């Protein structure tokens, strides 16, 4: 049986940052991810604030920055249109739209350079508590294996299985999880360069629609809805939105992403014996 100080399950930004800093502080770290490629498929609109990167001590790199955001356009349910400009008002949304597939790999590589080991195509299937640690059962490339860790960090996304196995309450009610669908599109008509657009109202019941620019005519166009507020799927709402919104009527999709987004906020319990959860797994 393999042994390590810290086993981190999930190599998204939260998992990779945890791996990096644990390794920098002298821990033996193993970071695993169930996918064969870290960062793929992307799971969000790819926006990040400058303040967020600064807090994480991540230096912006043109290799993973698609565009810089300095304006926000808000469209209310009654159609009122408000443009907020960084030059006139402080905006928490000011930052970048990323290439998440590149960004996530960049963070994982930083963790590796700090001393963390990484295993891809590795799925955690169960775990058992012992007095001095946790035994985690894994499947690596379809082959079973076991790892004993002093600490397990669950960075495995919404409704974390790691948290549930540890007895933490990570389940979410339907009203606490938005269903999301997003196209990356080309041919988007964006009137304001560097402007993030948020559209509220019936286009996305219980949530909102977004346009995150990634280039001159390229953008992530998506929305999130609450299943308690609509009988349609997020994908159906997305198709209706891109067909009717002026900036996207002539655009074409080159990628589709679907998934869930927790909106309930931070879970009450994040830590138990030898286990903690972080990132979306913790409701962050």
Regions found by a protein language model. Name each.
Residues 11, 25, 109-249, 267, ...:
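Predominantly flavin-linked oxidoreductase catalytic cores and closely associated redox partners
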Residues 1-14:
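Beta1/beta-strand and adjacent pyrophosphate-binding region of the FAD-binding site
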Residues 248-263:
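A glycine-rich dinucleotide-binding beta-alpha-beta segment and adjacent secondary-structure elements
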């Amino acid at each position: 049986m393999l042994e390590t100080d810290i086993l981190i399950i999930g190599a998204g930004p939260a998992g990779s940052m945890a791996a990096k800093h644990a390794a920098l502080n002298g821990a033996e770290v193993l970071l695993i991810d169930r996918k064969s490629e870290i960062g793929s498929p992307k799971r969000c609109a790819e926006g990040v604030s400058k303040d967020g990167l600064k807090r994480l001590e991540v230096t912006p790199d043109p290799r993973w920055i698609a565009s810089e955001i300095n304006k926000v356009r808000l469209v209310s349910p009654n159609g009122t249109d408000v443009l907020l400009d960084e030059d006139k008002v402080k905006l928490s949304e000011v930052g970048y739209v990323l290439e998440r597939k590149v960004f996530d790999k960049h963070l994982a590589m930083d963790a590796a350079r700090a001393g963390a080991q990484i295993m891809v195509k590795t799925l955690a299937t169960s775990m058992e508590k012992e007095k001095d640690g946790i035994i985690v059962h894994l499947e690596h490339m379809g082959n079973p294996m076991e790892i004993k860790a002093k600490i397990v960090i669950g960075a495995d996304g919404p409704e974390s299985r790691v948290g549930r196995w540890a007895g933490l309450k990570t389940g979410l009610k339907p009203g606490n999880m938005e269903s999301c669908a997003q196209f990356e599109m080309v041919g988007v008509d964006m009137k304001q360069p560097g402007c993030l657009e948020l559209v509220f109202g019936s286009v996305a019941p219980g949530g909102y629609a977004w346009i995150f620019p990634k280039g001159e005519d390229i953008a992530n166009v998506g929305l999130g809805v609450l299943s308690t507020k609509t009988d349609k799927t997020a994908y159906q709402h997305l198709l209706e939105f891109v067909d009717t919104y002026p900036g996207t009527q002539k655009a074409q999709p080159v990628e589709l992403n679907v998934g869930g987004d927790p909106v309930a906020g931070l879970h009450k319990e994040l830590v138990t014996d030898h286990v903690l959860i972080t990132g979306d797994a913790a409701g962050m």
